[in-house]
């Protein structure tokens, strides 16, 4: 099956990343960036433009956007790993930067500085060093692990950071508070309304008595959501069991263990490790009659029964808008509040719903009072552009 083949490929990418290939790609990018930079310098010299760095973009805060017409800003985008949610975010960051660039008469040059760490901490640290050496004007890390590395890498050079899809920026020690980050960093958060997901779960199955919590203990994005889930289930008198994993293989084993436990349902927050593995576990869960409730619409796209959470397309656009505010409009990240989203949209996978033996129309009617909208999807590898 197409989706199964892809999940195996993802697993190989995550667990056996060829670092030499990454280095060669990095060298190629640097050579291309150098050639493009030389050409751009010659071109802009004639019209008085040029590329900025973190210092000059801060110095330009007092200038109007019109005065910056013709400038080129180097934007480093660091995607933590490849999966539908983060792919959608990066795609929308790029498209919004392109649109804003045309609108403002400036260029946001991200292509030579976009890199994907594929979930490998060593590679992500290497990417951080490369972006600092490239003297980019801003770094945009996507997901908590990437944001933590980029924050550390920019502490001394003061390159501003605008993160995307960080579930709990305060607990991750990226910001002092959501309203006043306090450092040279701000961004967008995909903080999860855990209680809302469990309301959907218990509405669809009022007799739900045993819930599996499936996540990666090493993912900061899961920490608070799992704590909230336990508190909710304890208060509701619902028994739960935790199963964790740090790789696709381990998540597969954890899912099989939950099937053997005969849980009534499974909950996963906005966990990147489980998201990467979803295509390889959704069929076995559905065939076992276990609905999987998750914290991002990409889970439902990849086969989970239901998700409730952030619209990642809008989150990507908002992240790009914040990048523009910092670079062009001179906003200080330290005083720019972290943006959060709560669109109240539940996404139901109609194919999985059928496999589970659930009545889609009944589910939609039951979910309607609890959501602003109920969206239908079918299993696919990625969102259509």
Task: Identify the residue ranges that each predicted region occupies.
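Short beta-strand elements in bilobed, periplasmic/extracellular small-molecule ligand-binding domains
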Residues: 101-124, 184-185, 232-248
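C-terminal motif of bacterial Sec signal peptides marking the signal peptidase cleavage site
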Residues: 42-46
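An alpha-beta-alpha
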Residues: 75, 93, 186-236, 332, ...
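Hinge/cleft segment of the Venus flytrap/periplasmic-binding protein
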Residues: 19, 325-385
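Hydrophobic alpha-helical segments within soluble ligand-binding/sensing domains
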Residues: 68-69, 168-210, 310-331
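Bacterial signal peptide processing site
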Residues: 48-51
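Extracytoplasmic "Venus flytrap"
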Residues: 68-95, 100, 111-122, 218-222, ...
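Beta-alpha junction/loop-to-helix N-cap segments that form part of ligand/metal-binding clefts
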Residues: 112-176, 271-286, 290-295
């Amino acid at each position: 099956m197409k989706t199964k083949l892809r999940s195996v490929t993802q697993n190989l990418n995550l667990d056996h990343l060829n670092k030499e290939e990454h280095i060669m790609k990095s060298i190629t990018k640097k050579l291309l960036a150098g050639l493009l930079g030389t050409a751009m310098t010659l071109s802009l010299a004639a019209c008085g433009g040029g590329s900025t760095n973190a210092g000059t973009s801060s110095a330009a805060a007092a200038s109007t956007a019109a005065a910056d017409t013709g400038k080129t800003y180097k934007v480093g985008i660091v995607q933590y790993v490849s999966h539908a949610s983060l792919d959608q975010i990066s795609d929308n960051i790029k498209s919004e930067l392109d649109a804003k660039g045309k609108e403002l008469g400036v260029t946001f040059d991200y292509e030579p500085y976009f890199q994907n760490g594929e979930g490998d901490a060593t590679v992500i640290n290497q990417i951080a060093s490369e972006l600092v050496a490239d003297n980019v004007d801003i770094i945009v890390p996507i997901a908590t692990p990437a944001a933590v590395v980029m924050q550390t890498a920019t502490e001394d050079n003061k390159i501003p950071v605008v993160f995307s899809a960080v579930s709990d920026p305060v607990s991750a020690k990226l910001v002092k508070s959501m309203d006043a980050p306090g450092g040279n960093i701000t961004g967008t958060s995909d903080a999860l309304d855990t209680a809302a997901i469990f309301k959907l779960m218990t509405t669809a199955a009022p007799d739900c008595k045993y819930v599996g919590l499936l996540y990666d203990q090493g993912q900061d994005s899961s920490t608070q959501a799992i704590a909230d889930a336990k508190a909710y289930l304890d208060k509701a008198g619902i028994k739960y069991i935790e199963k964790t994993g740090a790789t696709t293989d381990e998540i597969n084993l954890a899912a099989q263990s939950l099937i053997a436990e005969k849980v009534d349902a499974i909950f996963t927050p906005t966990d990147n490790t489980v998201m990467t593995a979803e295509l390889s576990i959704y069929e076995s869960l559905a065939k076992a009659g276990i609905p999987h409730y998750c914290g991002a619409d990409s889970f439902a796209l990849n086969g989970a029964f239901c998700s409730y959470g952030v619209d990642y397309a809008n989150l990507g656009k908002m992240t790009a808008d914040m990048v523009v505010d910092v670079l062009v409009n001179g906003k200080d990240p330290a005083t720019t509040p972290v943006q959060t989203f709560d669109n109240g949209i539940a996404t139901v996978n109609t194919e999985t719903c059928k496999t589970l033996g659930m009545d889609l129309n009944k589910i939609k009617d039951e979910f309607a009072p609890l959501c602003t909208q109920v969206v239908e999807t079918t299993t696919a590898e990625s969102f259509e552009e």
